[in-house]
Amino acid sequence: MTFTIMTDSTADLNQTWAEDHDIVLIGLTILCDGEVYETVGPNRISSDYLLKKMKAGSHPQTSQINVGEFEKVFREHARNNKALLYLAFSSVLSGTYQSALMACDLVREDYPDAVIEIVDTLAAAGGEGYLTILAAEARDSGKNLLETKDIVEAVIPRLRTYFLVDDLFHLMRGGRLSKGSAFLGSLASIKPLLWIDEEGKLVPIAKIRGRQKAIKEMVAQVEKDIADSTVIVSYTSDQGSAEKLREELLAHENISDVLMMPLGPVISAHVGPNTLAVFVIGQNSR
């Protein structure tokens, strides 16, 4: 039986690619200067537009996908006897995953045999996107829903996410980083390198003076443990630094391909401009 793969706008997947690969995107929303912006569809807000507003002093807020939105999608699939695999934005960073679980319970009251599987990716941005790409490849190769789910869940503990943020104020403001860590990063051009740990929390792993040294440390962290030769690089604003990071990664003998994936508006709202991120699958668990 064929099945639908669905993920959030936080996966930062190109919408044309998603449509071509039969991936359903469901969007979080952004509130900025009294306006509510969509993050999927033809009227979605762009990251560049949002970042310009942030540079001008705006403080956007993001809203999780609510139960009703999930229920609508899940109910439609159940009514049409169509199986669905939903890869959710990290439960540590958003309540979206919990909303999906609640919606699933509501739908199963009327459709007890509905095939709806929900995976907490413990990931965001290119990491969530990476898992969705793997799921699409598995489905295209003939794997069924449960086999595809197993493949994704086996990779989650080995997915490594590294972030280099120019200004930690945005992460602190959104509650994604402690005030102490943010203050430390503001001292004397110290650039904390962050990663998502085994619990899905965003934590500093190194403190480096200067952006270029921090980028080199990011590459060094990636080189420690690589299982898949494909790496994803994401960025806001500074595409030039992202291209240099890509070149440094490609110089590694175990990396054959680096996908460039701009950070979408939801993640951009929390990290701000001049952010770099790398997503890689390691051999060992985090």
Curated annotation (Swiss-Prot):
DegV domain boundaries: 3-282
Listed Pfam families: DegV
Matching InterPro entries: DegV, DegV_C, DegV_domain_contain
PROSITE patterns per UniProt: DEGV
Keyword Translocase: no
A molecular function (GO) term: lipid binding
Keyword entries, A-Z: Lipid-binding
Protein residues bound to hexadecanoate: 62, 94
Function recorded in the entry: May bind long-chain fatty acids, such as palmitate, and may play a role in lipid transport or fatty acid metabolism.
UniProt name for this protein: DegV domain-containing protein SpyM3_1667
Species classification: Bacteria, Bacillati, Bacillota, Bacilli, Lactobacillales
